[in-house]
Amino acid sequence: MKVLFPFVGDSVGGSHRSILELYDALNSSAITPIFVLHEIGPLSSLLDSLNIQYEYIFIKNLAGESPYIPKIIFSIVFNFFKLNKFIRKNKIDIVHGNDLRINLTWSLPARLSGAFYLWHQRAVMSSSVLWKTSTLMADYFVAISECVYNSLPSNIPKSKKKLILNPFDTRKTYEIKDSRRWVNSIYSIPKNSILLGYIGRLVDWKNIDFLISCFAKYTKKSSLHLHLIIVGVGNDKYTNNLRRLVCKLGVNSMVTFAGFNYDPSRVISAFDLMVAPSDKEPFGRTLVEAMIQNTPILAAKGGGHSEIIDNGVSGRLYEHNNIDDFISQFNLYINNSKYTHKIINNANTIAKLKYSSHSHAESIVCIYRQSIIT
């Protein structure tokens, strides 16, 4: 059985790491995974470093790059024959899409070639009635969380959709002190500081400006030696706005913009506290990575965060955009180390039980095999 994973290639995020976890599991089965990229960039560099082969197919305009319906339709039609030919020539059985642009571009060429199309939805879908047409484009839908599952179009029958949690390598953990020394050396972090960390894309809806404001307010009232590291990349305009905010609030000596890092779990293991300030996360992959690495979590309440974190049991949640509640929850970590260790241990146990790569792969492969039978 040949399973094709097409990707744009312009970024590396949670969906890519989830598929790489699945890839490792599939390699030991009778399934042949094949990667296709449409851009040479961050993802191709990562695959090269892992010695994973991929095909490159140039696509000038992917469907969904523009929100205008006529342009989406034009891109689907324009790219149809090239992709349909590739699927037929390589005798692909299943196309597994993990990105909106990929799903819109590849789904019809796949279905009309006779291949099975699996639409892996990793973001909350809007309430637009146009999404009801997605049932014509895909054979099956997988959602990564309850909030994503509940946002799927109501006309998708239950027999054609499933909630499957993202996979993680729960066995791979780092020694905290070694990780901290490594991060200190790379980014010149003060050795004795309490290190708060954010890791993810630098985009507006991630609410990083709120985190910076909270950090600045706390440091002005506290004698603790705190440092904030922001790991990730975004467009220049937003990133520069964040840098200006840091300078405006007078905390530029206590905030490090680290850029992209290929080993997020190792970075997370160096944090004394990981902060996730968005309330709109469809899942929250970095939260689970922190749970595995025994790093305590402070996250905004809402979205996938509320599904992953049991407040006060496996992490702490604060009310979205409420600075006072943020500070209050942070103080609970700082002032009660014994209870913090209990939360860390609870979180680690939960992560290992719920998010193993093995159980994820079993669920996905079950869908693959069922597609061949039907």
Positions of the model-derived regions?
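Short hydrophobic beta-strand element within catalytic cores of glycosyltransferases
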Residues: 296-299, 309
